[in-house]
A protein has these predicted regions:
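Short, intrinsically disordered, charge-balanced linker/junction segments flanking boundaries
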Residues: 424-427
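Conserved cytosolic headpiece of P-type ATPases
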Residues: 1-421
Length: 427
């Protein structure tokens, strides 16, 4: 079932979960990101085939992607390294373009800062051409940009309102949008320069796993609250959550990290039962949610794959580390989900409940056998039977009957009815 149990108590505790926080990419969605649209900041879409006719835009976009990434093509022509977004972008520009950039000594990266969940952008400085390239969340780049390149490579003023409407419309279709830009100034760590020019934006699609929809439904029927945590913008997260079956009722809440951090602990606790989505989430949000849930006596499950997720995985009652994640995350988690699939998390919960029921059955069996033996041994002498159960009889009962019974009851199959039961609270 693609579930590796690192700590034995993890699987039994999984059956007692009250709330489960799950990452989106690769767990609820397929993790097979694909660039489906490129458009300039005036909203004009340019297909991958047509880009070669827009020389200046293509040249700068290739640099913004190919020289500002952790991914690469291997000798088997497959994209490796980086995250799923890096890999999707590299496939978009193609292996030929990447290899040409990689072998060009005239565009060596002199300084680089990778993407992190706090900044929401990455940047690379190419000193030989005097430009710093940016890749990241549109709201971060657009906050510093006033100009953009049109399809002909001309620099023009941005209509922020129209562009944001375009981004919102794509987000409502469950698409993730990334922006690219360049600056003539030097790279400044954790900062976007104020002379930023937008090269263009891409829409990336990552469809929900069909198996995840059914698994989410089963977990919800088991009385477990499922909350999706993602780095996507709120509109994109809401669209995906609706598709996955997480947002069904008007009372269900979707919050951004910024909204969450504006609320006090008591305010978050008050609306916690209605929360279904946390967008633009930070690793600190995960740790905070685990702490608040445990203060409410809830048994908490948390998924994660990065080094920054380790504190939350360790603090949660059950940390589900992803098989494709870092070793630090796997060490912090009690269970490793080898295929990164939400369906496997559902299986872990199911078998956790099965183990509990099997232990309960064995305890009942033992109680009946031992109480019967005690009653017979205690009552029989009053009926004239001095030694109804000899030592050999008791040894036979304990070693043979109990042993066989334990093996049979301990290996009873998982029953679907277990996923219909209400979870057990910590208290």
């Amino acid at each position: 079932h693609n579930v590796l149990v690192r700590k034995a108590e993890g699987i039994e505790t999984a059956g007692s979960l009250n709330i489960l926080f799950s990452d989106k990419t690769g767990t609820i969605t397929k993790g097979e990101l694909e660039v489906v649209d490129f458009f300039t900041a005036d909203g004009t879409s340019i297909s991958a085939n047509e880009l070669r006719h827009h020389g200046k835009v293509k040249g700068l976009l290739d640099l913004a992607i190919g020289k500002n990434t952790q991914a690469m093509f291997d000798v088997y022509h497959k994209v490796i390294g980086g995250n799923a977004t890096d890999q999707a972008l590299l496939k978009f520009i193609g292996e030929e373009t990447f290899c040409m950039l990689d072998g060009n000594d005239g565009c060596k990266v002199s300084a680089h800062q990778g993407f992190n969940s706090s900044n929401k952008f990455s940047q690379a400085r190419i000193e030989s051409i005097g430009k710093t390239f940016y890749k990241g969340a549109p709201e971060r780049l657009l906050a510093k940009a006033t100009k953009y390149l049109d399809g002909d490579g001309q620099i023009k003023e941005i209509d922020q309102k129209a562009l944001n409407q375009k981004i919102d419309s794509l987000a409502a279709k469950a698409m993730r949008v990334l922006a690219f830009g360049y600056s003539e100034k030097e790279l400044v760590k954790n900062q976007i320069n104020d002379d930023l020019v937008i090269i263009g934006l891409v829409a990336i699609r990552d469809d929900v796993r069909p198996s995840a929809k059914d698994a989410i439904r089963q977990v919800q029927e088991a009385g477990i609250q499922v909350v999706m945590i993602t780095g996507d913008r709120l509109e994109t997260a809401v669209a995906i959550a609706k598709d996955a079956g997480l947002l069904k009722n008007e009372s269900d809440r979707a919050l951004s990290s910024a909204q969450l951090n504006q609320m006090s602990d008591e305010e978050v606790k008050a609306i916690l039962p209605q929360i279904r989505v946390i967008a633009r989430a930070l690793p600190t949000d995960k740790s905070r949610m685990v702490r608040l849930c445990q203060e409410m006596n809830l048994v908490v499950g948390m998924t994660g794959d990065g080094v920054n997720d380790s504190p939350a995985l360790k603090r949660a009652d059950v940390g589900f580390a992803m098989g494709s994640g870092t070793e630090a995350a796997k060490e912090a988690g009690k269970i490793v989900i080898l295929d990164d699939n939400f369906s496997s998390i559902k299986d872990a919960i199911w078998y956790g409940r099965t183990i509990y029921h099997n232990i309960l059955k064995f305890c009942k069996f033992q109680l009946v056998i031992n109480v019967t033996a005690v009653v017979v041994s205690a009552v029989a002498p009053f009926l004239g039977i001095e030694e109804p159960l000899k030592v050999t009889h008791l040894l036979f009962v304990n070693l043979v009957m109990d042993g066989l019974g334990a093996m049979m009851l301990g290996n009873e199959p998982a029953l679907s009815k277990y996923m219909k039961e209400a979870p057990r609270r910590r208290d």
